[in-house]
Structures are given as C-alpha cells and as structure tokens.
C-alpha cells in the first residue's frame, strides 16, 4: 500500500518466504514453533492449553536478556495466554503465514518496497545467528538500512532506549 505506508520498520524478522525456503536444522531448532503452531486445529491449541507458563519461560522467552521482562509484565503474558481464544488466534496467525501469506508473497516477488525501510534485529537472537538479516530484505527493499541492537528477539523489552532512538531518528 504505497499510497498509505510512507516508512516501514521491521523488527527482528526476515521475510517469511525466506524462513520457509531456507529451513535448516538450526532454524528448525530455534523456530520450531513456526512448524508446531501451523499444525491443524486443535492440536497446538490443546497442547498449549494450560501450559502457558512453561511454554513462555522455556521457549518463547529463552535467550532473553535477564530481567528484561519484569514479573508483572510476564504475569500479563500469562493472563493473555490463559485465554483459549488468544492461543487460537496466535496459531491462526502462524497458519496464515504458512499458507495464504506465502501465496501472496509468491505473487508479489517482483514488487519492491518504495518507502524508506529500517530493519532492526537483536545481535543475540536467532535471526542474527541464522541469516544476514539486512541482506534478506535487499531483494524487496533495495535501499533498506538497519543494524543489530543489543538484544535477542524481544527488542522493545530488551533494549527500549536503543530501539526508541533508532525509530525516532528513522521516523523524524
């Protein structure tokens, strides 16, 4: 939507198509949830139901900079994950990413982003370990700029000042 989107910031992500076309053992280990959450309903929902705390502590927030998420904030994540509709919506988002979103990506492969694009990722995260993050965006956003921040995947929680400064400069 070039008439609407004038600037784009991408946080610790590579194109979905890149993830699915460049699967490796390391990617599958770090990003197994991409393959687990796309399984047909109700399997992921059923397995996650009632198990939000171990899922969040041992997987979703693994590699997180210590104390980046305060206990009251973690409690809010738990509250949200206790709602079966939240878990179902999360699974549906990943299911769309592996189906209709990929179809749209294939149809748009030759389209390049015209707006200024900022790509930020965590130097301690899986994306940094597995990909040249900025280069994965070059075919779609040739003028993209970006850098690694001192974080894992959770940039807003792990390095809020650095993220805010980078976004403020980019959006000014």
Task: Give each language-model segment a name.
Residues 1-148, 168-170:
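Flexible "cap/lid" subdomain of the alpha/beta-hydrolase fold that forms the substrate-access gate
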Residues 152-164:
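Catalytic histidine-centered segment of alpha/beta-hydrolase-like enzymes
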């Amino acid at each position: 939507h070039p008439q609407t989107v004038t600037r784009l910031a991408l946080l610790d992500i590579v194109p979905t198509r890149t993830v699915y076309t460049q699967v490796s053992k390391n990617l599958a280990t770090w990003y197994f949830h991409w393959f687990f959450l796309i399984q047909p309903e109700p399997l992921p929902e059923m397995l996650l139901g009632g198990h939000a705390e171990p899922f969040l502590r041992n997987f979703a927030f693994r590699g997180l900079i210590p104390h980046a998420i305060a206990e009251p904030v973690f409690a809010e994540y738990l509250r949200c994950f206790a709602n079966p509709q939240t878990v179902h919506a999360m699974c549906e988002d990943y299911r769309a990413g592996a189906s209709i979103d990929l179809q749209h990506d294939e149809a748009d492969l030759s389209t390049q982003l015209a707006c200024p694009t900022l790509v930020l990722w965590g130097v301690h995260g899986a994306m940094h370990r597995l990909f040249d993050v900025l280069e994965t965006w070059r075919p779609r956003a040739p003028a993209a700029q970006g850098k690694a921040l001192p974080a894992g995947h959770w940039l807003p929680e792990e390095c809020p000042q650095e993220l805010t400064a980078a976004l403020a400069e980019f959006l000014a």
